[in-house]
C-alpha cells in the first residue's frame, strides 16, 4: 500500500505529537454537497450508491476535493449489517430507513445469525477502491453502528422517537434483546475486521441511540457489547496501529466507563465541554469533536469564535481530533464548512509544538 502523506489524524488519535489539530466531519460526504446530489441521482437510490464501488469511491473523495480534510470516511450506511442478515432494508421517501422484517417475535430472533461477510463484499470492495483513489493522501476510516443502535432499527423496524418497542423488550424479555445484541456484536466485529483487511486505517463505532438508555441499561445493553467488539478487533495492519473511536451520542455521562473499554478515542457530541472531558478521561483516550453542526449556520465570525473556544477548552498538546458533535446537516453551506476546516488548521497550531 502507498505510504501516507498526511498521517496527522492517526497520530492525534494515538496522542503522538502533531503540528496542528486534524479535522474531518461526520457525514462529510453527503447531501449538503451539490456534487454528492449529482452522483446520487446518477446512482438511482441511496442503497444503489452504497453498492456501486465506483460511485461510492467518488462520493467518499468529493469532500476532500473541496476541503483540506485530514481523513476520509467510507461512504456506506450502518444498516448494511442487518440488511445482510436478511431483514430487507429499504428507504421510504421522507421517512428514512425501514426494514421489511422487523425482529419482534421470538421465533425470528431465534433464527438470527451472523451474516456471511461475502454478502457485504461490496463494502470491502469500496474500501479497497477508496484506498487506491486516495493514493496515500489521508487515512481512510471504516465504521459500523453499535450493536444497540443497530438493534433499535432492527426491532422498531425503522427509526423511532420513543423506542417503545425495543425498551419494552429490554425490560420484559431482556434475554431476547441480549440474543440480538450478541449476534450484532459478533457481526460488527467480523465486519470491521474485514474493512481493516480491505484497507481501513482507523475504525469508528457509532452508538447513535445509546444516549436514550438509563445509566444501568447503557452499561448492560450497549457498552458491554461495544467492549466485546473492541476486544475482538485487529489493532495492527500494514505495520501500524489501527485506532478505534467510539462515539455515543448523548454519552457524556459515561465517559469514564467508556474510557475503560480499550478504545483509542471517544467521540463527543456538542453537549459536552471538551476541556472537562479531557480532565476526566484525557489520560486514557484521545477525544474527537465536538462542534455543534448547527453552529455552521452562523456567520463566518461566529464559526471562528466557536472553533477558537473548543480549541482553547481542549488546550495544548495532542490527543484531539476536531469534528462535529453529530453529522453535518444537509442544509449546511459548504462555504461555511470550508471556513470551519481552514480555521481549525489555522488556529490550532499555537497549541502544538514548542
Curated annotation (Swiss-Prot):
One of the protein's GO biological processes: protoporphyrinogen IX biosynthetic process from glutamate
UniProt keyword GTP-binding present: no
GO molecular function: uroporphyrinogen decarboxylase activity
Membrane-traversing stretches: none
CDD domains named among the record's database cross-references: URO-D
Keyword terms, alphabetized: Cytoplasm, Decarboxylase, Lyase, Porphyrin biosynthesis
Cellular component aspect of the GO annotation: cytosol
Keyword Lyase: yes
Record site: Transition state stabilizer: 77
Pathway where this protein functions: Porphyrin-containing compound metabolism; protoporphyrin-IX biosynthesis; coproporphyrinogen-III from 5-aminolevulinate: step 4/4
UniProt-listed InterPro entries: UROD/MetE-like_sf (IPR038071), Uroporphyrinogen_deCO2ase_HemE (IPR006361), Uroporphyrinogen_deCOase (IPR000257)
Binding annotation for substrate: 27-31, 46, 77, 153, 208, 326
Catalytic function, reaction form: uroporphyrinogen III + 4 H(+) = coproporphyrinogen III + 4 CO2
EC main group: lyase
A Pfam family annotated for this UniProt entry: URO-D
Matches recorded under PANTHER family: METHYLTETRAHYDROFOLATE:HOMOCYSTEINE METHYLTRANSFERASE RELATED, UROPORPHYRINOGEN DECARBOXYLASE
Functional note: Catalyzes the decarboxylation of four acetate groups of uroporphyrinogen-III to yield coproporphyrinogen-III.
Assembly and oligomerization: Homodimer.
Family to which this protein belongs: Belongs to the uroporphyrinogen decarboxylase family.
Protein name: Uroporphyrinogen decarboxylase
Amino acid at each position: 500500500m502507498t505510504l501516507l502523506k498526511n498521517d496527522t489524524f492517526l497520530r492525534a488519535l494515538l496522542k503522538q505529537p502533531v503540528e496542528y489539530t486534524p479535522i474531518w466531519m461526520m457525514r462529510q460526504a453527503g447531501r449538503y454537497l451539490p456534487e454528492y446530489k449529482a452522483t446520487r441521482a446518477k446512482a438511482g437510490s441511496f442503497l444503489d450508491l452504497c453498492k456501486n464501488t465506483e460511485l461510492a469511491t467518488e462520493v467518499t473523495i468529493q469532500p476532500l476535493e473541496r476541503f483540506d480534510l485530514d481523513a476520509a470516511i467510507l461512504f456506506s450506511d450502518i444498516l448494511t449489517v442487518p440488511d445482510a442478515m436478511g431483514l430487507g432494508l429499504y428507504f421510504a421517501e421522507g421517512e428514512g430507513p425501514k426494514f421489511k422484517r422487523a425482529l419482534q417475535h421470538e421465533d425470528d430472533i431465534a433464527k438470527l445469525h451472523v451474516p456471511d461477510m461475502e454478502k457485504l463484499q461490496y463494502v470491502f470492495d469500496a474500501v479497497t477502491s477508496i484506498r487506491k483513489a486516495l493514493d496515500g493522501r489521508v487515512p481512510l476510516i471504516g465504521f459500523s453502528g453499535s450493536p444497540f443502535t443497530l438493534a433499535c432499527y432492527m426491532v422498531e423496524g425503522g427509526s423511532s422517537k420513543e423506542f417503545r418497542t425495543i425498551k419494552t423488550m429490554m425490560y420484559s424479555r431482556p434475554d431476547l434483546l441480549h440474543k440480538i445484541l450478541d449476534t450484532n456484536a459478533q457481526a460488527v466485529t467480523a465486519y470491521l475486521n474485514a474493512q481493516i483487511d480491505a484497507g481501513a486505517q482507523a475504525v469508528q463505532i457509532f452508538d447513535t441511540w445509546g444516549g436514550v438508555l438509563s445509566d444501568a441499561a447503557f452499561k448492560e445493553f450497549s457498552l458491554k457489547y461495544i467492549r466485546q467488539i473492541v476486544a475482538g478487533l485487529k489493532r495492527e495492519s500494514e505495520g501500524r496501529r489501527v485506532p478505534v473511536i467510539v462515539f455515543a451520542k448523548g454519552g457524556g455521562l459515561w465517559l469514564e466507563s467508556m474510557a475503560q473499554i480499550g478504545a483509542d478515542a471517544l467521540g463527543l457530541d456538542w453537549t459536552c465541554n471538551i476541556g472537562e472531558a479531557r480532565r476526566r478521561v484525557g489520560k486514557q483516550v484521545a477525544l474527537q469533536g465536538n462542534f455543534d453542526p448547527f453552529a455552521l449556520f452562523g456567520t463566518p465570525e461566529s464559526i471562528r469564535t466557536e472553533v477558537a473556544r473548543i480549541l482553547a477548552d481542549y488546550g495544548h498538546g495532542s490527543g484531539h481530533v476536531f469534528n462535529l458533535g453529530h453529522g453535518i446537516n444537509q442544509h449546511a453551506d459548504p462555504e461555511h464548512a470550508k471556513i470551519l476546516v481552514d480555521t481549525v488548521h489555522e488556529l490550532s497550531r499555537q497549541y502544538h509544538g514548542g
